Structure formats: C-alpha cells, structure tokens
Amino acid sequence: MDKEKYSFMNPKGIETFAFIFSGNALQWLHGTTTDDNGRKIGNFTLFGDLLARMALADGTAKGFHRPLTLSVGQAQYSEEQLSTQWSMGRKRIRRLLDELARLELIDTSRSRVASVMTFPCLLQWMTKDGSVVSNPFIHKQRERIEPL
C-alpha cells in the first residue's frame, strides 16, 4: 500500500473524548515524525489513527488472519500493517510504539497470535448517541482522577 493512497483514520462514532496526558506526552503529540520518504506526519495524526482502531463495543476484530475477541477500549494492530500504511520500517514502528507506551499513551500486548493495544490515557468517551463509556484500561494511578 502506498502511503500517498492511505488516508489516516479518525475515530468514528465518538462525539468527545476525555484524556489525561503528561507534559512529555503533550509535547510528543504536538511534534512530527518523518516517514521513510522524508514526509512529516503530525504525531497527533498517528495517535488518532491508532485510536480509530479501538473497539467501541465488545466483539470480534475483523480484517486480520485470525479473528480475535476484543473488549471495549482495545485495538488489534499489526506492526507490518502499520509499517506499510505509515511508510516506515517495522523496527521504526516498534520503536515508535515503545515510545508511545513509555509516554503512557498506549499499552501493548504482543503475541504470535495477535497484538493488542489499549489507551491508558483515555479516561472516557461519549458516543454519538450521548452515552458515556468509561475506559476499562486506565492505569491504576489514574483511577483516582475524576473525569469531567
């Protein structure tokens, strides 16, 4: 897949989000990453693309070789797929995901069967129909913070 043909995804079906970011995470989100072709991509665009993969309801993820049951707030991903879509090498994708985990923007769980990420910085979201969903994957130290 040519990145020029890939349209970065935006979360669908969500009216608003409530996040909590560290200062370092905010700095990263406002920065850019250069792909293998020398094009700059806003880091918030990359984060939004990952967030758009998040399950909004419990169910089976489609589009991968092996179906995987996901809970609300989880996203299945493939480093190989991200590498192709974002025009970056797989090692670079791995380092980028590791950096996002260090900044507590995502948590990842990798296995031979599937790779799953969660978004511990996401407190809750409101769907288009007005229902509020609390993120079940908030880090423990964040649970004491009251969302707006």
Predicted features by range, described:
Residues 1-11, 89-148:
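Winged-helix/helix-turn-helix nucleic-acid-interaction surface
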Residues 23-27, 34, 83, 92, ...:
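A generic structural signal for solvent-exposed, polar alpha-helical segments
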Residues 54-118:
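Winged helix-turn-helix DNA-binding recognition segment
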Residues 1-79:
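Short recognition helix of helix-turn-helix/winged-helix DNA-binding domains
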